Amino acid sequence: KTNVDKLLQFDMIGDLKKLSKKVISMQEGPHWFFQDYKMEEQIWWYNTLTEFDMLFAHNKKDVKYYEGLTNKPVHKMPTLMLAERLGIIPRNEWGDAIMIGGNMVRWYGGFDSYVVAQEFDMPIYAPSMGRKIDREDEMDITHLPYMTWVEWMNNLRQYHVGVHMMPTHAAGTFTLNCAYHGIPCIGYRGLDTQEELHPLLSVDDGDIEEAKYLANKLKEDEDFYQECSSTCRELYEKSLYTEENFVPYITGIFENIL
């Protein structure tokens, strides 16, 4: 966690504006995260946000949040995938196993993902994240070791389905990574990568019943599985998450502010 009380000692925006005509902030984590700070730190962060010339946010709902909070220009910052540049091997074969998107804490919604993943009657795997808790290894989940992103992407391509019932909406990289490989992913609405790339597999927050229904449909209906697989890959190719589409989008934003 950022040591915010140390930042309070500096005129951060003033110092930055000595170096640049425009100062821009990019969201990291959920938009409500600063509200877990001490009261004086919350006020400091709010005042700091209002001093930026422009903000970038993860999701459409985050754009609305920061626009309302700051009255500053806010744009969506898509997570850019540089898979080809980094040597990611596209999916060409896969096994009968499920990948859930996080550990057993509220932040990741790992327990909800585990419940939904059980519907497939397949081995369940999970990445090891920073919030992994004691005794997780005692569950019938195979935890992968900590990996670089390239190692993660080349490992992910072998899995049948992704399940990511994460209530904390931020950059949405798990669902995005799945879409790159054409892996159907069940998850919550409100996360742009989920809604945009896996529209047939997006459910309302907390709707485990619908998520389990979709899991069984993917399991039993091969045509539905193939539709979800091809759809997410096709939507990824058309999205702002690819370098081809991202570059003109972000260039236009910067040209307008400079």
Identify the function of each model-found stretch:
Residues D53-E67, N71-G87:
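Donor nucleotide-sugar binding/catalytic pocket of nucleotide-sugar-dependent glycosyltransferases
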Residues R157-A170, I183:
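Acidic donor-binding loop of glycosyltransferase active sites
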Residues K1-Y66:
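Extended catalytic core of nucleotide-activated donor transferases of GT-like folds
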Residues E220-N256:
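A charged, aromatic-enriched C-terminal amphipathic alpha-helix characteristic of glycosyltransferases
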Residues A83-D137, H143-W149:
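Conserved catalytic-core segment of nucleotide-activated headgroup transferases in glycan assembly
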Residues M153, T175-H181, Q194:
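Short alpha-helical segment that forms part of, or immediately flanks, the ligand-binding pocket
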Residues T148-Y159, Y180:
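Short acidic alpha-helix that forms the nucleotide-activated donor recognition element
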